Amino acid sequence: MVIKLEFEFLLLLPLLIIVGFIVGILGSLFGIGGGFLVAPILTFIFDYFGIPDGVKFAVGTSLFVVFINSIISIFRHAKIKNINWKASITIGIISLVFSYFSGFLVVNFIDSAILKKLFGIFLIANAIYMAKSHHIDKISDREDKLEPFILCGVITGFLSGLFGIGGGIVIIPILAMAKYPVKRAVAISVGVIPLTSIGGLISYLTANTEGYIYNIGYVSIPIALIMAIPIIYSSKLGIKINQKISPKHLRIMLSSILGVMGLFMLL
């Protein structure tokens, strides 16, 4: 991808680093990949520089960052034995297939402007649900069942490839509806995101984008790496916060972030 190293772009470098740092914290804290934050900000950057198909580049690059973040987050959570591997693998395999399918649709058929608005509506709807779901704060535990995992895998995978997210912000509300406590949902979500994100990422990496440099398909390698480096360091902080924060505060924080980013995408 051609992005001239103008003064304006140099000013954006600190923003990319800061966002990467925040995404690393959020990834470990909520069991999410951070795509809901990365994709909107990259959409703004690519639109600002007049990059054709900016939303598709934002989604593809976001999935790459999400994948890196999720791998780091898995190692962090595995150390404290906070991953439900059985549930994660079940949801992850199903979501991988559907994320590849929806990623293929975006790359080949869906208009970028429509995609941006759909993403904003999706984030706001999730924010409203999480804000109103007081009941999940009091749930202590429940037995694993296959049905919610299958539903979760289908919906998560499809939306992941569509919007460039890892799926954590989809998994947690769906599991909350199935009466899983927030922290249990986080433990499941952490193991799902690498599989979900790689499914959609393949479609964007293999897309034909002739005429650009420094990219593979719809993935901007320089920007992805700039954002990924601080994630390595900040993800550890997210784990510490996760162990200390209450389910109620965890839910409220996630709802607030989703709402703000959703409005940002609709403006």
UniProtKB/Swiss-Prot annotation:
Q: Which subcellular locations apply to this protein? A: Cell membrane
UniProt topology in membrane: Multi-pass membrane protein
Record's keyword terms, sorted:
Cell membrane, Membrane, Transmembrane, Transmembrane helix, Transport
Q: Does the keyword Transport apply?
A: yes
Q: Where are the transmembrane segments?
A: 10-30, 31-51, 55-75, 87-107, 158-178, 185-205, 213-233
- Matching InterPro entries, A to Z? TM_pro_TauE-like, TSUP/Inactive_protease-like
Into which family does the record put it? Belongs to the 4-toluene sulfonate uptake permease (TSUP) (TC 2.A.102) family.
Recorded protein name is Probable membrane transporter protein MJ0441
Q: Which organism is it from?
A: Methanocaldococcus jannaschii (strain ATCC 43067 / DSM 2661 / JAL-1 / JCM 10045 / NBRC 100440) (Methanococcus jannaschii)
